[in-house]
């Protein structure tokens, strides 16, 4: 497994299969790009099936054991099942989607090897959802969630971007996943660097504090140092005093309890310190960081060129948020105590098992 100069190994890749999307979400930096008919064959500027599979084989050579397929909307690709089926056998495959194409395809995707899915759902109300996504597909998304559950993809993660227009919907989304077995909620901090409109950003610590008061149990994932909150359904009548009884023997949750995870990268050096992914764009460029476009390296067509691009990308990865590590006199790296408290700003929870992407 390759490591960058900051000691971060690369164990996962995110592969964008297209920048096309049938939604036009107001917070997205790729708003409704391209031909949104689907599913269709890859466009001329999109990675072919063979190039995607060849790249995944190269990543696997370097110890990468997980891939997340993204877009745009990856299900606009008609070859999605073929890509998943040809992914190395011991590489975990997950996908982020808006869910509208899952009915009728979810079972085939699972049969091909898909293991997990994240579905974007930013509100529980049809009108609010339409305003956020510029689509009338709310019912189709709900059907997609059900199709994923029926196909055996539980737990299904619902992705919700948290910013001014959606902050008021967080409590009902939390109640929804707490009351519904098989669902989890991933709250994603709005990133104005990618989408503009800095006035839409909110203080994500307020959401952390609210969830901490509500949660029965709190833990932290090693990846990105993400905080997880296990929350009981209000209908279940459970309180924090019942936390010891709310945990199953394998460390999971009982059916009347849901998990909420916060992805909060903005200004968070601990997030960067625990990032173990590189990204491949839909048109064949590797990048070491989602927020940067000054480090793009084309993967070319051949296995040899892909190996060279992968090595170079990993070697040149630099944390986006803060110099949390500094050079020592002997050329090594050490924690920058002036920038980041060694213990961090969070309570020292034990890292949880990294069971989902």
Curated annotation (Swiss-Prot):
S-adenosyl-L-methionine binds at residues 27, 72, 120. The keyword RNA-binding does not apply. Binds 2 [4Fe-4S] clusters. Binds 1 [4Fe-4S] cluster coordinated with 3 cysteines and an exchangeable S-adenosyl-L-methionine and 1 [4Fe-4S] cluster coordinated with 3 cysteines and the GTP-derived substrate. The keyword S-adenosyl-L-methionine applies. [4Fe-4S] cluster 1 binds at residues 21, 25, 28. InterPro entries: Aldolase_TIM, Elp3/MiaA/NifB-like_rSAM, MoaA_arc, MoaA_NifB_PqqE_Fe-S-bd_CS, MoaA_twitch, MoCo_biosynth_MoaA/MoaC, rSAM. It comes from the Archaea. It is an enzyme of class 4 (lyase). Residues 5-234 form the Radical SAM core domain. Its EC number is 4.1.99.22. It catalyses: GTP + AH2 + S-adenosyl-L-methionine = (8S)-3',8-cyclo-7,8-dihydroguanosine 5'-triphosphate + 5'-deoxyadenosine + L-methionine + A + H(+). SUPFAM superfamilies: Radical SAM enzymes. GTP binds at residues 14, 68, 96, 157, 277-279. CDD domains: Radical_SAM (cd01335), Twitch_MoaA (cd21117). GO terms for biological process: Mo-molybdopterin cofactor biosynthetic process. Its cofactor is [4Fe-4S] cluster. HAMAP family: MoaA_A. Catalyzes the cyclization of GTP to (8S)-3',8-cyclo-7,8-dihydroguanosine 5'-triphosphate. PANTHER family: MOLYBDENUM COFACTOR BIOSYNTHESIS PROTEIN 1, MOLYBDOPTERIN COFACTOR SYNTHESIS PROTEIN A. Belongs to the radical SAM superfamily. MoaA family. This is Probable GTP 3',8-cyclase. It comes from Halobacterium salinarum (strain ATCC 700922 / JCM 11081 / NRC-1) (Halobacterium halobium).
């Amino acid at each position: 497994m390759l490591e960058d100069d900051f000691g971060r190994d690369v164990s996962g890749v995110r592969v964008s299969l297209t920048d096309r999307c049938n939604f036009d979400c107001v917070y997205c930096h790729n708003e409704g790009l391209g031909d949104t008919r689907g599913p269709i064959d890859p466009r001329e500027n999109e990675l072919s099936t063979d190039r995607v599979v060849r790249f995944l084989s190269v990543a696997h050579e370097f110890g990468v054991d997980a891939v997340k397929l993204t877009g745009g909307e990856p299900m606009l690709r008609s070859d999605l099942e073929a890509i998943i089926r040809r992914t190395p056998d011991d590489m975990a495959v997950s996908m982020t989607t808006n869910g509208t194409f899952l009915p009728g395809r979810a079972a085939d995707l699972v049969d091909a090897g898909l293991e997990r899915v994240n579905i974007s759902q930013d509100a529980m109300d049809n009108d609010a959802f339409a305003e956020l996504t510029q689509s009338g597909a709310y019912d189709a998304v709900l059907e997609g969630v059900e199709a994923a559950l029926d196909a055996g993809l539980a737990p299904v993660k619902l992705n919700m971007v948290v910013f001014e227009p959606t902050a008021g919907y967080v409590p009902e989304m939390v109640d929804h996943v707490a009351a519904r077995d098989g669902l989890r909620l991933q709250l994603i901090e709005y990133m104005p660097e990618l989408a503009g409109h800095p006035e839409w950003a909110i203080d994500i610590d307020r959401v952390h504090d609210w969830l901490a008061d509500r949660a029965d149990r709190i833990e932290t994932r090693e990846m990105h140092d993400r905080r997880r909150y296990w929350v009981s359904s209000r209908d279940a009548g459970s309180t924090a005093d019942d936390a010891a009884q709310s945990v199953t023997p394998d460390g999971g949750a009982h059916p009347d309890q849901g998990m909420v995870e916060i992805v909060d990268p903005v200004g968070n050096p601990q997030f960067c310190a625990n990032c173990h992914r590189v990204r491949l764009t839909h048109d064949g460029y590797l990048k070491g960081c989602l927020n940067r476009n000054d480090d793009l390296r084309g993967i070319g067509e051949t296995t040899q060129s892909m190996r060279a691009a992968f090595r170079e990308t990993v070697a040149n990865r630099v944390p986006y948020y803060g110099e949390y590590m500094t050079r020592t006199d002997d050329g090594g790296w050490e924690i920058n105590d002036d920038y980041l408290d060694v213990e961090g700003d969070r309570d020292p929870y034990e890292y949880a098992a990294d069971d989902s992407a």
